[in-house]
């Protein structure tokens, strides 16, 4: 599985939102900016700013690839639950499709707050809520159930997105704005569909028989060809101030 391709695809879903929120948060005036869970650098590689950019991730392989895509960024191998930075270091700290994967998302937000300067901003650009996923036609509901179970097997919290704003509040972050991302469920191009199915096949391998995966993949393709496919996963964002 080419994860940089996947992360780059996810980055397209939030590009307009990121432009809006980074402007609101004063990206052009910031001196230091941190991405927690930077992965392969899909977001960092797109940032245009004079600020000193920093990225942290728990996966050494992802960081190695991030160095290729974002060579000017200061990268650190570390855990979001215990950030290896002094208090009040950054003007902006953000994450992207991260908190659902974190064992203790509230602690991660507390740490993000700790390393953010007074008056600085914390942004969570995208956190999905798979517990309210919609799949149509009904024959594809099973796919959603499988994917949700797969996330749980991998240690994720599929319903975290709906609790994002609550978690900001509990972490003591003053919320400026929160809501759901619009347009994530738009009809994918053939290439995007193949990327999506590469992720599905990777996730389901080992606990769903291969023939069942291929059967539901054909059903998905046929439903899209008939114009009947509906897939909606509510995906939340929040940004606030320290």
Residue ranges and their predicted role:
Residues 2-3, 175-231:
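C-terminal helical/coil "lid" or tail adjacent to the Rossmann-like core of SAM-dependent
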Residues 34, 40-82:
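Class I SAM-dependent methyltransferase SAM/SAH-binding core
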Residues 1-15:
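Class I SAM-dependent methyltransferase Rossmann-like catalytic core
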Residues 81-92:
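A short acidic, Gly/Pro-enriched loop at the edge of an enzyme's catalytic core
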Residues 106-118:
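A short glycine-rich, Lys/Arg-flanked "PGG" loop and its adjoining helix->strand segment in the class I
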Residues 91-104:
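A short SAM/SAH-binding and catalytic strip from SAM-dependent methyltransferases
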Residues 123-190, 205-209:
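Conserved catalytic/acceptor-binding region of the Class I
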Residues 12-31:
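Conserved alpha-helix/loop element of class I SAM-dependent methyltransferases that forms part
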